[in-house]
Design a protein with these regions (language model features):
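Structural/interface elements that position substrates and couple domains in central-metabolism enzymes
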Residues: 1-222
């Protein structure tokens, strides 16, 4: 997905002194293979660094907003309408539907790191009560909310089943995966947990079961 994203970028961000602007533009034109001409933004190295982490902080904030609203609707007895509500909000062009989906909190190697980096930098320059800190704290709380929610919903106390444990589908990255975190929390509370993907078995907790369950299971599906 990294290569695909690189070849289909919405924009290209370059930090530096601008002496090699034309060479870099030509290089990215080749990367895009002539199909797309993204907007290219040149700025100082420091400004580019801030832009990169601030962009990801915006996305984590949007993810957290969707999850916060999902919590509100769930606690109001309207969990069946979460998708409809979020799709309605996302239909407003000022908002957009990308990253506006209820589910697990953000994870992986980039979003948590960049969100904390932006929060730390903002505090360093004197902006203490910044969105980065709030978003990171909510993401932690959301993991706890989901654990309590799924345990409550599993009234039959049957084994839980995950399709995958990575932070998103079709990757092998477990870094800060809320799916894997939930799995461990459930195991630590004495629940049986099955996973449909055994490709990362050697990296995961040995208590996880991978054989096809013959009993009824409670599927973790968001």
């Amino acid at each position: 997905s990294i290569i695909t994203d690189l070849q289909n970028a919405d924009m290209v961000l370059i930090g530096g002194d601008g002496n090699h602007k034309s060479e870099l533009e030509k290089m990215y034109e080749k990367i895009q293979m002539g199909f797309i001409s993204p907007s290219i933004y040149f700025m100082s190295t420091k400004a580019a660094e801030v832009t990169k982490i601030a962009l990801n902080c915006f996305l984590t904030t949007k993810i957290s907003y969707a999850n916060m609203l999902g919590q509100v609707l769930t606690m109001s007895g309207m969990e069946d309408e979460i998708d409809n509500v979020l799709n309605s909000i996302g239909a407003d062009k000022r908002v957009g539907k990308k990253y506006l989906k209820y589910g697990f909190g953000f994870g992986g190697p980039c979003f948590p790191r960049d969100n904390r980096a932006f929060a730390s930098y903002a505090s360093k320059v004197g902006v203490d009560h910044n969105i980065g800190h709030v978003t990171d704290a909510f993401n932690e709380d959301h993991a706890t909310f989901l654990k309590e929610y799924f345990i409550f919903k599993n009234k039959k106390k049957i084994p839980f089943f995950f399709n995958y444990l990575t932070y998103k589908p079709n990757t092998d990255i477990l870094t800060e995966s809320q799916q894997y975190r939930l799995c461990l929390d459930l195991l630590n509370e004495g629940h049986l947990v099955y996973c449909g993907d055994s490709s990362l078995k050697d990296q995961c907790d040995s208590r996880i079961l991978y054989e096809k369950p013959t009993e009824q299971v409670f599927e973790i599906n968001l």
